[in-house]
């Protein structure tokens, strides 16, 4: 009988100790699903002067020409770029990276959100492999598709909802340049409003961080550099998160925005992105204002305005500490890279995280253990070659 365990999501740990996030690498993933390690080709640079707002920028412009390459990816949840970046770092240092859990920021955020959201709003369907003393966590691609289909069905999705999603990508397109300002021709700057908006190219920062005694490596998509990039240095302090939302017009809107800001804070604090920039649009999708928030000041801001949401920041950290500690306690980890890999399923249902070991008779077993559903053969061989 394999490992099986449940964790009630209303439980909290006592730890609030966080390790300072540090960038250990980065890569670009292209719209053609190529992974360019230590390559910042897809890194964008923030540029949105206040004067631009006077132009009444239309965030719905270009909706019909939107290109979503991401939906056609063969494996949109792939750990390949993350693993190749880790291997590159290990080859440089000649030793295995010191970490307990390796995954994406989005997965860590989903697990933390279990303490605040229902399974219908926050679908969690993860696979975990225990290899070489570390846990590698990946989302099931089918779960991503199902979650999107479910939310679309429940909401009675219409063109306005697709348009609202598009305005987020449009805001990013209007607010960023592909190169630093000094290297960007005036013609490119002036024609930004005409650029075709697409979704597929990504720049990913790979960050070492931790909570309590658990050390994590998280991959996180970065929207842009706010000021300048330092070559060969940790650039976390220069990154910014871009978001777009509806104007705040009344108390109800305020509470809705506070909940959004909490989720954005969660995204940013996990990997140490210090700056959040929100664009606010009116009912006609015109960009009206842009506001900047300091990630570290968001908990204080929320606490002063809405104590209930403000207390969620500390609750999130306590739950983060507990759930990572629980995973490390429940899942056996053998340091020997030649030992048998073990695979597990983690889902969120009925107010519990449910962990179960995947047995040899399960149809997923072969792909997770012997195949490349999570770990590539190249990465497994690399680890076996490390002394």
From Swiss-Prot:
The keyword Translocase appears for this protein: no
GO CC terms of this entry: cytosol; Las1 complex; nucleus; RNA polymerase II termination complex
Mutating residue 221 to A: what's the consequence?
A: Abolishes the decapping activity
Catalysed reaction(s) here are:
a 5'-end NAD(+)-phospho-ribonucleoside in mRNA + H2O = a 5'-end phospho-ribonucleoside in mRNA + NAD(+) + H(+); a 5'-end (N(7)-methyl 5'-triphosphoguanosine)-ribonucleoside-ribonucleotide in mRNA + H2O = a (N(7)-methyl 5'-triphosphoguanosine)-nucleoside + a 5'-end phospho-ribonucleoside in mRNA + H(+); a 5'-end triphospho-ribonucleoside in mRNA + H2O = a 5'-end phospho-ribonucleoside in mRNA + diphosphate + H(+)
- InterPro entries, alphabetized: RAI1, RAI1-like_fam
Specify which residues bind a divalent metal cation according to the UniProt entry for this protein: 172, 223, 241-242
Per the annotation, which location comes first and is thus the protein's main one?
A: nucleus
Q: Name one GO molecular function term.
A: metal ion binding
Spans annotated as Interaction with RAT1: 273-387
Question: What Pfam families does the entry give?
Answer: RAI1
Which keywords are on file for this protein? Answer: Hydrolase, Metal-binding, mRNA processing, Nuclease, Nucleotide-binding, Nucleus, Phosphoprotein, RNA-binding, rRNA processing, Transcription, Transcription regulation, Transcription termination
Positions of post-translational Phosphoserine modification: 198
Tell me how the cofactor is bound.
Answer: Divalent metal cation.
Q: Which enzyme class, named as a word?
A: hydrolase
List of residues binding substrate: 221, 243, 267
UniProt EC number: 3.6.1.-
Where located?
Nucleus
Q: Name one GO biological process term.
A: nuclear-transcribed mRNA catabolic process
| Function recorded in the entry | Decapping enzyme for NAD-capped RNAs: specifically hydrolyzes the nicotinamide adenine dinucleotide (NAD) cap from a subset of RNAs by removing the entire NAD moiety from the 5'-end of an NAD-capped RNA. The NAD-cap is present at the 5'-end of some RNAs and snoRNAs. In contrast to the canonical 5'-end N7 methylguanosine (m7G) cap, the NAD cap promotes mRNA decay. Also acts as a non-canonical decapping enzyme that removes the entire cap structure of m7G capped or incompletely capped RNAs.
Protein family (similarity comment): Belongs to the DXO/Dom3Z family.
Query: What does the annotation say about its assembly with partners?
Result: Interacts with RAT1, RTT103 and pre-60S ribosomal subunits. Interacts with RAT1; the interaction is direct, stabilizes RAT1 protein structure and stimulates its exoribonuclease activity. The interaction also stimulates RAI1 pyrophosphohydrolase activity, probably by recruiting it to mRNA substrates.
Write down what this protein is called: Decapping nuclease RAI1
Lineage, uppermost ranks:
Eukaryota, Fungi, Dikarya, Ascomycota, Saccharomycotina
**Protein's gene:** RAI1
